[in-house]
Regions:
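Gly/Ser-rich "nucleophile elbow"/oxyanion-hole loop immediately N-terminal to the catalytic nucleophile
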Residues: 58-64, 118-159
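Primarily recognizes the serine-hydrolase "nucleophile elbow" in alpha/beta-hydrolase
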Residues: 150-197
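A domain-start/cap signature at the N-terminus of enzymes
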Residues: 1-67, 163, 222-223, 233
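Cell-envelope and extracellular/periplasmic
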Residues: 72-79, 139-146, 158, 165, ...
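Short, solvent-exposed loop/turn and secondary-structure capping segments
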Residues: 62-64, 79-85, 119-123, 167-168, ...
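Short, proline-enriched alpha-helix->beta-strand connector loops that line the catalytic pocket
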Residues: 103, 197-203
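Active-site machinery of serine-nucleophile hydrolases
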Residues: 68, 72-134
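C-terminal catalytic histidine-bearing segment of alpha/beta-hydrolase fold enzymes
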Residues: 204-206, 210-213, 218, 226-293
Length: 293
């Protein structure tokens, strides 16, 4: 035990000079007031709640064409209310620093209709949300909120949201410019990756080598060479997922998943608190990669 926290199962294999960090170093909720909350009625599905950020309300010109970044949360996160903005990895994209790096961007955070059944199990997640329903929401948002104008269409997903990100790309490759799945072991087959290349879809594939929910050696390693062969695929597979304090990340909500929650450092633009990049190939972080598309 350490800091009254369970010792992670991987604690005995971390470097000798490393330390375990039991929580992210950032404050949750600081930018929630920059988001609006609305609901969308699909043609043949229950209403979906979503949050959004409009850059033209925060100093950017109204007549400019902007990218849209949509964030798909992980399992059970929709049950957390406004906190899902943060858990999905979208909150800090409303920060002035991030928006400046992107030249302004609309942000969209849809919520799956999650609930707990009588046994306490989470139901209604992305696995029970048809891809056409999510497409309908995003397409409608572009038309209603962005005047039908968009420079880039980017989809980011965490955990089960990363699975849904791939699922959306597999069905609507022509609709997206970039996919950023974080913590997904279900890498599409060669035929689908060929389609991504044909449709000029850029891929940022991110997963930790000690992800507790996805066996890296079994699920990821056999697909790495194929990912490297894509036209535009950035692969980020850190040996250890770290928090802003440079400690190795541990999160335990009944089971250890700190190494699965790569979304937290991704949310921090892959920057440590002292301003140094977590990934030397990305001196300007994730926002720099997005801005370069």
């Amino acid at each position: 035990m350490n800091q009254n926290k369970p010792l992670p199962p991987w604690a005995n294999i971390i470097p000798k000079d490393a330390f375990i960090s039991y929580s992210p170093t950032y404050k949750v909720g600081e930018y929630f007031d920059r988001f609006h909350k609305e609901s969308f009625k699909p043609a043949d599905f229950a209403d979906l709640t979503y949050y959004f950020y409009d850059p033209s309300e925060h100093g950017f010109p109204k007549d400019k064409t902007y990218p849209l970044i949509t964030f798909l949360h992980g399992a059970s996160n929709a049950l957390e209310g406004d906190v899902c903005i943060n858990y999905a990895g979208g909150e800090f994209y409303a920060k002035d620093q991030y928006q400046k790096a992107l030249g302004g961007a609309y942000l969209l955070i849809p919520l799956a209709n999650e609930y707990r059944d009588e046994e306490g199990r989470v139901k209604g997640g992305w696995g029970e949300t048809p891809v056409n329903v999510l497409y309908e929401l995003i397409d409608s948002f572009i038309k209603r909120k962005m005047g039908g104008r968009i420079s880039k269409n980017i989809l980011i997903g965490n955990s089960s949201g990363a699975w849904m990100t791939f699922n959306m790309g597999n069905n609507y490759a022509w609709f997206f410019d970039a996919l950023i799945p974080v913590g997904a072991g279900e890498i599409p087959d060669d035929k689908m990756l060929d389609l991504y290349d044909k449709e000029n879809v850029s891929l940022f594939y991110a997963i930790g080598k000690h992800d507790e929910l996805n066996d890296f050696e079994t699920l990821v390693v056999p697909r790495l060479e194929r990912l490297k062969a894509m036209k535009n695929c950035f692969i980020y597979t850190p040996e250890w997922v770290q928090n802003g304090d440079k400690g190795i990340a541990s999160i335990n909500f009944g089971f250890e998943m700190g190494q699965h929650c790569l979304v937290n450092p991704m949310h921090c633009n892959l920057m440590f608190d002292d301003g140094t990049p977590m990934e030397p190939r990305l001196p300007n972080g994730v926002t720099g990669w997005i801005a370069s598309l």
